[in-house]
């Protein structure tokens, strides 16, 4: 599952807020996010409107902190469990 979330980045003189796609595991725990902030997109006006509606829903959710997310991903990298289960191919 994924949704848009507002993420705060603390700068030296000010904070900035941007929208990111955030991905969750089956328990609702954040397991990943887009590398870059998202912009509204659609291949039609209707799709663009739908994307904007999803983005507006992010404003009703708690703001996430970029430093906290970075710390979480350092301690438990996204997809770590999946990668840990992959064995290298052995040539014969």
Predicted regions and their residues:
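Short linear sequence elements within intrinsically disordered, low-complexity coil regions
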Residues: 9, 22, 28-29, 46, ...
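Short N-terminal "domain-start" leader segments
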Residues: 1-20, 25-27
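A general marker of short, structured functional hotspots
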Residues: 13-16, 20, 37, 50, ...
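Generic structural signal for short, flexible, solvent-exposed coil/loop and linker residues
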Residues: 8, 12-13, 29, 48, ...
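A short, exposed loop/beta-hairpin motif centered on an aromatic-Gly-Thr core
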Residues: 31-44
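Residues in flexible loops and secondary-structure boundaries
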Residues: 14, 27, 41, 67, ...
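Low-complexity intrinsically disordered segments
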Residues: 45-92
